[in-house]
Amino acid sequence: GTENKTKVEDIINLERYEYFDYDLYPDYQNSIGFSQRGCRLACKFCVVPKKEGKNKGNSAINGIWRGDPYPKNIVLLDNDFFGQPNWQEKAKEMIEGKFKINFSQGINIRLIDEESCEMLPQINYRCSKFKNKRIYTAWDNLGDEKIFMKGVERLTKYGVPTSHLMVYMLVGFKKAETMEDILYRFNKLKDLKCLPYPMVYDRNNKELKKFARWVIQRHYKFIEWEDFSQENRNKFYRDQKGSEDQMDLFHNNCVVSALSETGDT
């Protein structure tokens, strides 16, 4: 979402720079890098196409790995892995090299095809902590419902369960978007058994920030949105006849449940 189009290469006046200063984080064990740059899409809220251009290949997977004694955990910064010309070779590297891959920037589910879906379950894809199986993707626009659902259908056809999908939901970008529109997307994702994750575009919108909190901390498993909203929240707890301590315990249980379930935070 940032409007900053400056690249490291622009600052140091090099055509390409792919080195990461791990010395800043001496205890960090994973390997970080790009196997590709750019994106096939041109979303209005995203700077990637302007900053990185069209999709092109970058480093090999073995080139990203820091080597022994570091674990074969790769944090990919790719914005469109399956859009690069030689993604099959890099997927083969992942599989044959027995790497764990965190697709940290997600995959483009709207553009995913049969070949990509067939290959993906063979890759050991993981969450950011490399504990749970996780694929990150997005459903940012209500109008993309059909193509999003088609992508989900393709993934499940080839063995990626919906419970492995964390789906980012951009909220607050479209001025005409209503809370009903947002809840429609959320409920669809919940019914699919995906993990919804709202991304609030307008950080000044308190209601949307509250909605994000309700979803991300998995309060929705215990409280309806109407009850969680600020004007009704206190009334809800009073109706439950809960003391202040019980309210705190209830909140903590929600958070613990969310964290233990996802393994992503």
Describe each PLM feature range.
Residues 5-9, 41-45, 52-55, 83-85, ...:
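Short catalytic/ligand-binding loop motif for oxyanion handling, primarily in non-cytosolic enzymes
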Residues 43, 91-92, 186:
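Non-transmembrane alpha-helical segments in soluble domains
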Residues 93, 154-157, 188:
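Alpha-helical scaffold elements within enzyme catalytic domains, especially in hydrolases
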Residues 159-160, 170-265:
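Auxiliary Fe-S-binding modules of radical SAM enzymes
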Residues 1-3, 49-151, 162-172, 195-199:
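Core AdoMet radical
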Residues 27-65:
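Canonical Radical SAM [4Fe-4S] cluster-binding loop centered on the CxxxCxxC motif
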Residues 40, 68, 129, 157-159, ...:
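Alpha-helix termination/capping residues and helix-transition junctions
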Residues 1-32:
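Glycine-rich beta-alpha loop elements in corrinoid/cobalamin-binding modules
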